[in-house]
């Protein structure tokens, strides 16, 4: 537990042939590292959508961990990490970055609960989008927290449940998200492939 209370998730669609992965690793990663060092954010990771195709609406998810929601937009400019850039270099970078990707969506969650069996970031995150009926949120969170007791005896490397807080309303497609973390695809299949009978407690 690194003390994070909020998670920002940005859904990115890359443009083929524009090398957004290189931009991500050489520029935005450096900015994130500086923001972490300065204490503005607590963590930053880029996750590739393994099942994405040309028709998928996103192929990268950028996850930012925050303790203070007011720091979400603080110290974000690329010049914070590369103060030596000239105006022309900055303009060229902004043009290249803009042409290499589209920001499809950006969401903010508060961390309800999580549990990890290891210090390092797992290799695979399986996202489960949940729609919880208004008025049932407390009982739903209580039920999800009950799963935590089973993590140690499962193939999971970690688990989390997040409540969406950037938007509310009955028209939302989801208002919660659970995340199952694994290190190998074979561990994912150990849980996903079998069909289990659900107990009355979790129906």
Language-model regions, residue ranges each:
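Short S/T/G/P-rich N-terminal loop/turn motif that feeds into the first structured element of a domain
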Residues: 1-86, 91-203
């Amino acid at each position: 537990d690194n003390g994070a209370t909020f998670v920002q998730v940005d859904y990115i669609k890359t443009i083929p042939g524009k090398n957004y992965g290189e931009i991500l690793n050489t520029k935005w990663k450096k900015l994130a590292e500086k923001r972490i060092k300065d204490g503005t954010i607590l963590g930053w990771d880029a996750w590739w959508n393994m099942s994405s195709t040309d028709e998928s609406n996103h192929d990268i998810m950028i996850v930012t961990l925050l303790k203070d929601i007011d720091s979400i937009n603080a110290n974000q400019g690329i010049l914070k990490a590369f103060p030596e850039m000239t105006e022309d270099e900055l303009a060229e970078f902004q043009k290249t970055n803009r042409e290499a990707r589209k920001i499809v969506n950006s969401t903010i969650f508060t961390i309800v609960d999580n549990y990890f069996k290891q210090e390092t970031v797992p290799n695979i995150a399986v996202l489960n989008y949940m729609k919880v009926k208004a008025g049932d949120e407390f009982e739903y969170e209580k039920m999800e927290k009950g799963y935590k007791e089973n993590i140690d005896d499962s193939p999971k490397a970690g688990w989390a449940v997040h409540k969406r807080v950037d938007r509310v309303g009955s028209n939302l497609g989801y208002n919660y998200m659970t995340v199952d973390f694994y290190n190998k695809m074979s561990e994912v299949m150990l849980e996903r492939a079998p069909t289990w009978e659900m107990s009355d407690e979790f129906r």
